[in-house]
Amino acid sequence: MNTLTLALRGLTRNHRRSIVTLLAIAFGFAAISLFAGYTHNIYSGLARQSIHGELLGHLTLSKRGMSTAGKLDPQRYLLTLDEVARIEAALQHEPQITLIAPRLAFSGLVTNGRASTIFIAEGISPQAMDRLQENMLTEQEARSGMYDRLAKKLDPARESGVALSAGLVELLHLHVGGEAILLVNTLSGQANAMDVTVDGSFNTGNAGTNDKFAFVPLALAQSLLDAEGRADRLTLLLEDVTQTEAIRDRLLAKLSAAGFDLEIATWQELSSFYRQVHGMFNMIFGFIFSIVLAVVLMSVANSVGMTVIERTREIGTLRAIGLKRSGVIRLFATETLLLTLLGCGVGFLLTVGVRYGINGSHIAYTPPNGANAVPLLVDMDYPRILLTMVLMLAVGMLAAFLPSFRSARQHIIDALGHV
Amino acid sequence: MSLSHPRVSVPTQRPASTLLQLREVGRRFMLGETPIDALHAIRFDIHAGEFLAVWGPSGSGKSTLMNLIGLIDAPTTGEIYFDGHCTGDLSDDELTAFRGKNIGFIFQGFNLMPVLSALENVMLPLHIRGVGGREARTRATAALQDVGLAKFIHSRPDKLSGGQRQRVAIARALVVEPRLVIADEPTANLDSHNSLMIIDMMREMNRARGVTFVFTTHDPRLLAHVDRKVLLQDGCIERDESTP
């Protein structure tokens, strides 16, 4: 028999109270873990959507000032064919970089011959587009079929083939295989128009852009803008998303040493939507976390407080037969630790069960500003589950400390005389 | 409790070594703003191997005296010496360790842990002292055998009779091989048959092992079994008699 056994037996003394406290911990733990799992799924989904769905890649490399002054004077900040080639050469031995894709963004009018509307387009090579969209969906998401229209495709064999967002196709009564005309200003300010074929349509996933976005082959974009061989930025795809920041810093130093005055933005910096959603969910998570921890704190404090009162004579007896004050605190701390651990264990099982139920029930919802429904999925966010457990243990110990400290300080004869 | 009561202290003359010395020990409690003197300048020695009963009417200060002798309470005035060492100099942790090693307790209400078996209850003081599991189990089993409860080692207290529970408590008190056992009204919750059995058992342990026993009682019949009886009245020793 040791302190652990004694603590375990102590928990069985008033098993109803122990079970109620355990369930409070378990439900709190499960609530936090499930919400953490849900937000994890949202974060990873948004990250994949930003990197692969919106074709941001992991890093975007452009001339310094392109994102500010370059908006008004793009010609001055575009990368030349020679610069693109030199940068690609400088980066070709970077093992973490799996793709370097020159891009050229532009806007203009698109018409079906009877009506016109504005569009925003990205010029990119069809091969790079395919590479960037790899790993966009998880197996589960792909199976759900809800994301089928998110894929963007350009035919590398067709120089004038474009992909238009679904809203744009609908707005202009176009159809896949049909013709449209793109009208833009060249870099020098001349009007330029070109017939294109609608090779495909896609859903941007965002109601704000789904009626104006287009992808065109890079060569077509360069031809439209009269910007032969030029690009406004290079999109880099990395092997490991967690290395994004570190590689950005390394590349910046390397390219700067090679004489380039460039800026490199991470996908997180470019995706304000991701940052906003991340910030909002973190705030909600913190709020829920605080409430649950407060409930756990009060439950454990109440439970230990009642236990201490109930077992005052027992504490007196233990003290009389040689248990030191620290031993009394250790005993109740061990009981609380066990109760909290068991609560977290039951909470974990609840999390697994409820998650299985949610993920298997194919619940779908349309997120704010979303263009289509998405499945409600919950991940297992193990780092935050572990953090929740550690914090719950800490809170439990904190809640147990004061009543057990008081009981340990009590005079033995008062404790023995307690009725 | 009268403050003017005459204080009588009768030191006993015995060949055995002195285990415990109380020197002008007083104990005052505060009842709100009112001070209550439970013991008045007690001067009193306990010798190793004695089987001693403290008796007297309710409120005479018996339990207070036992608490002081058992070192679970501290005197307001005076000093208590255990084996010649002043216990007032010890810190709480030192005193607790000292108690765990030298003093066994038998309580009126048995004070057994209800969630532990008889064996585990007896192992408890050994566990507190850091004795290993196997050795603690062996010693606790032997202690329970000594009090005739070999068949009940796995029984929880609620499955035992009052007499059996008190025997478990005796085993728990003796398992650490203490030098002194304090028993505050050990027979108060028992019938006369069990009371005599418990006293006989304590007496036997006293004779066989030389452990010093000090207990309080209301029951005058039990006084016939002791070799020294101290009458306490109004916080003072009224009479200290040795039985030949």
Region annotations inferred by a language model:
Chain B
Residues M1-R28, R239-P244:
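ABC-family P-loop ATPase nucleotide-binding domain
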Residues K229-E241:
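H-loop (His-switch) and adjacent beta-strand-loop-beta switch element
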